[in-house]
C-alpha cells in the first residue's frame, strides 16, 4: 500500500468527518445571543397532555399506568372537566381536558398541530381519527365543525390505548359519516389550537410539534399550517418552543422567527417501523443520523429515548444542542436514558418531581 494512497484515505476520512460535523451542528451560540433565544424550560413534558386514554397506555406499561391514569382523571376533574360519574374517558390524549389536567399537575405539555379541510389549526397527532375515535377518516378531509361532533374514545374505559372502531369503519370503503349533532353527555373532541392556548394561558411551557403527511415534501398547504400556527403563537404570551420531524418546518422558523427556540425531531429506524421502500429508508436513516440539521440548525434535538447514547446525539449535544427525549413510558426507561437527555417527554407513569 503506497504512502500516497494512505494519505488520500486519511484526507478523505477527515473531509467526511468534517462534513458530518458541519451537517449536525446546531444553531451557534452567537446566533442565539443575537436573537435572545430562550432555553427549553426545565420541566417534565406530558406527551399529548396528561391523559386517561390514548398513547402509551398499553399492556406493556400497565404496572405503572394505573397511577398515571388516576392522576389524569383527578387533575381533569379538578380543572372542571368530567365528574366521578363519568365511566368512560375524561381526558383523552390531545384534548382540552388532558391539557388542563397537565396544567393542574404542573407539567409542561407536548402537543401536535394539523390543519382541517376548512383551514383551521387543530391539535391532533395521527393523520386520521381511527386510533383516537374509531373513525378512519383523515383530519385534512374534515371540517372543524365536523370534528366537534366526533367524540374521542367514545365508548372506551379509562386506560384504553386505542378507540373501539365505529360501525362501518372497517368496511372497504368505510361507511362512517359525521352525526348531525353532538352526542349527549360528557365527551371531548379534537380541539382548536386557539382554544388550547386559552386553557393553558401561560401556566406551563409548551412543546409545539408541526405535523405533516410527508416530512420529505413541502407545499402550499404546509406553508399555510406554519403561518397560521405561528400567528396563534405570536399572539400567545406563554412560554413555548417548536419542533418537527420535517427539517423544512424547523427551517421556516429559522428564516421567519429566529427568536423562537426550535427543535429537530428524529429517531433511528428500527424493527417493524422501518419503511420497506429503500429510498424512504435511506432518507429515514439520514434523518436519524441528524444529517439534515444543516437545514434547520436547531437549538434542541428531540430524539427517541433509545438513541440518547448514539454518536450523532452525543455529537450534537457536545456542539451545543439540547437533547430532549421522547417518549419515556416507565421509570425503567427513564433510568436507561436519563444520563443522555436534559429534558423528557413522558406518559403512562408519574415521574418524580424534578
Show where each model-derived region lies.
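Phosphate-group recognition and catalysis centered on beta-loop-alpha active-site segments
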Residues: 2-354
Amino acid at each position: 500500500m503506497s504512502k500516497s494512497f494512505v494519505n488520500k484515505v486519511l484526507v478523505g476520512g477527515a473531509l467526511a468527518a468534517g462534513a458530518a460535523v458541519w451537517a449536525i451542528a446546531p444553531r451557534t451560540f452567537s446566533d442565539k445571543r443575537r436573537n435572545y433565544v430562550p432555553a427549553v424550560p426545565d420541566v417534565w413534558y406530558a406527551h399529548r397532555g396528561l391523559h386517561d386514554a390514548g398513547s402509551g397506555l398499553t399492556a406493556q406499561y400497565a404496572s405503572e399506568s394505573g397511577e398515571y391514569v388516576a392522576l389524569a382523571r383527578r387533575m381533569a376533574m379538578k380543572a372542571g372537566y368530567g365528574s366521578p360519574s363519568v365511566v368512560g374517558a375524561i381526558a383523552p390524549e390531545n384534548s382540552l381536558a388532558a391539557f388542563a389536567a397537565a396544567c393542574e399537575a404542573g407539567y409542561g405539555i407536548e402537543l401536535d398541530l394539523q390543519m382541517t379541510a376548512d383551514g383551521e389549526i387543530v391539535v391532533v397527532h395521527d393523520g386520521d381519527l381511527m386510533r383516537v375515535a374509531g373513525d378512519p377518516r383523515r383530519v385534512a378531509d374534515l371540517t372543524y365543525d365536523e370534528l366537534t361532533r366526533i367524540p374521542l374514545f367514545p365508548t372506551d374505559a379509562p386506560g384504553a390505548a386505542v378507540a373501539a372502531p365505529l360501525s362501518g369503519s372497517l368496511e372497504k370503503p368505510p361507511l362512517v359519516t359525521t352525526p348531525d349533532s353532538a352526542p349527549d353527555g360528557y365527551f371531548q373532541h379534537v380541539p382548536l389550537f386557539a382554544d388550547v392556548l386559552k386553557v393553558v394561558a401561560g401556566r406551563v411551557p409548551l412543546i409545539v410539534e408541526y405535523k405533516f403527511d410527508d416530512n420529505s415534501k413541502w407545499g402550499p398547504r404546509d406553508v399555510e399550517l406554519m403561518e397560521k400556527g405561528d400567528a396563534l403563537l405570536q399572539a400567545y404570551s406563554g412560554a413555548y418552543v417548536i419542533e418537527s420531524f420535517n427539517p423544512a418546518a424547523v427551517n421556516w422558523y429559522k428564516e421567519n422567527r429566529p427568536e423562537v427556540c426550535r427543535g429537530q425531531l428524529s429517531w433511528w429506524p428500527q424493527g417493524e417501523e422501518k419503511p420497506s421502500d429503500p429510498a424512504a429508508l435511506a432518507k429515514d436513516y439520514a434523518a436519524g443520523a441528524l444529517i439534515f440539521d444543516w437545514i434547520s440548525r436547531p437549538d434542541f434535538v428531540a430524539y427517541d429515548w433509545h438513541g440518547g447514547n448514539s454518536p450523532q446525539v452525543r455529537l450534537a449535544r457536545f456542539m451545543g444542542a439540547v437533547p430532549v427525549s421522547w417518549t419515556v413510558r416507565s421509570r425503567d426507561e427513564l433510568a436507561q436514558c436519563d444520563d443522555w437527555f436534559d429534558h423528557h417527554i413522558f406518559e403512562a407513569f408519574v415521574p418524580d418531581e424534578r
